Amino acid sequence: AWSDTAEPARLFPSAAAIADAGADAIARCGITPARARSVIALARAVASGNLVLEPGVDVDATLDRLRALPGVGPWTAHYIAMRALRWPDAFLANDLIVLRAMNETRAARAEAASAAWRPWRAYAVMHLWKGAST
């Protein structure tokens, strides 16, 4: 594996190791070449310190940096904010399950309707996902 450290039941490479691995190595893990290039770009940004993915960072600036990466759109940026930044107001407005659960077809309308859930929209997203899986 590519990791410098291991935890019980967990072994994951550092951002620098992923960045150095190259897109071909990432693609061999079953990831499409385009996504592999996105993963490499993200890893390089994190390894260089240009992108910090930790709770407490400026969320808006981090979302902007994420969306500037190749292959990273609003869904991916908000998902990373929800998980890595632990941002409770992340909202995946163009998520198919979210749109269906909200009986919406347009992300802009889902975004507007979600205003009532601020600042806890990430919890609403998880609730909608959970409801769809049962």
Give the ranges of each region predicted by the language model.
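HhH-family (HhH-GPD) DNA N-glycosylase catalytic core used in base-excision repair
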Residues: A1-T134
